[in-house]
C-alpha cells in the first residue's frame, strides 16, 4: 500500500495534490483543521473543499489536526509508518499582512509546524519523499533593489541586469542563487525561511529525500481568495461579482509569475520519481506566465466579457511586497526534463472566471 500524507489537504495545493496522487493509486491521508477560516474569516473556509474531497476520493481519510500538535501528528505517522511513501506539507499561515498581527501564531505554525512534520517523518518513515511548499518571500525585498524600469502597464527588469547578477537567469528571472540573508522578509517570510532552512537541513544532515519549492503566485480555480492573500483569485472574484478592489501601491504595475496548482503538484510528482536530499527550487509560472495587476484586470475583463474598472490605487504598498518577481525555472527543468507548464495563465484565468460565474449562478 502506498500512502501520501498531505497537510493543508483542503487548501489550494493540498486538494490538488490529493486528486493527483489518488489518481495515481495512492491512499490519501489528509491533515487540515481549517485554520484558513480563522485567518481570513468564514468566506475563506475550506469546508466545501473538504466535502468535495471526501465525495471524490473513496478512501480519503481525514484528520482534523493542528500541525503544532506533535503528539497527534506522531500518532497518525506511527499508525501508517513505513507505508507512508510521500509527505506533502502545504499547511501554513500564508499571509504576510496577517503574520504581522500575530507573529507568535505565524511562527508556531510555519516554523514549528514544519519542524514537527520533518521530525515525525524522520522517526516513522525516513525513506519517504518530503515536499515542502516554501515561498519566494524567503528572498525578502532584495528583488526590489534590482534595476527596474517603469513601462506602460508593468515594471520590468533592465536587460543589462541579466548579465550583471549571478542570480538572474538568461530570460531575466530570479534563480535560486539569490541570497535569503540581509533583507526584509516580512514576519511571514522569516518564519518560512526558518522552515525552508530546516527542510534543507533534514535533507542534507539526515540524508532524507526533501524537496523545497519556493512558490511564486500559486493559483487555480480551487483558491479561496481573500483580500490579504491570493491576488489573482480575489481579483477575479471582484470583477465577476462587480465589487470594488484596492491595489496596494506600485501603481498596479507590480509583476508576478503565476503557476497553476496542477503544474506545481506535477513538479512534486517528478521530484518524487527521483528525489534529492534538501534541494531548493524556484517554482512559479516563469516569464511566459507573468502579469501585472493592470494587465490582469484587462485580461480578466476580456475573458469574462466585462468592462469592470471599479478599482482604486492606494499609495501605500504592503511592507516588503515585491515590485517585480519572476521565477527562473531552469534548475528544476535541468534536473527534471520531463516536466513542463501545461496550463498557461490565460487557461488558468479562464478556469477561475468560469468557477466564479458558476458560483454566482448557484446563489
Map each language-model feature to its residues.
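Short, solvent-exposed loop/helix junctions and linker helices
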Residues: 7, 67, 108-111, 188-189, ...
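NAD(P)-dependent short-chain dehydrogenase/reductase
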Residues: 142-173, 187, 193, 197-272, ...
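Solvent-exposed, non-membrane alpha-helical residues enriched in polar/charged side chains
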Residues: 54, 74, 78, 200, ...
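Short, charged helix-to-loop "capping" segments that act as catalytic/coupling loops
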Residues: 36-44, 73-85, 122-129, 227, ...
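Residues in well-ordered alpha-helical elements
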Residues: 71, 97, 104, 115, ...
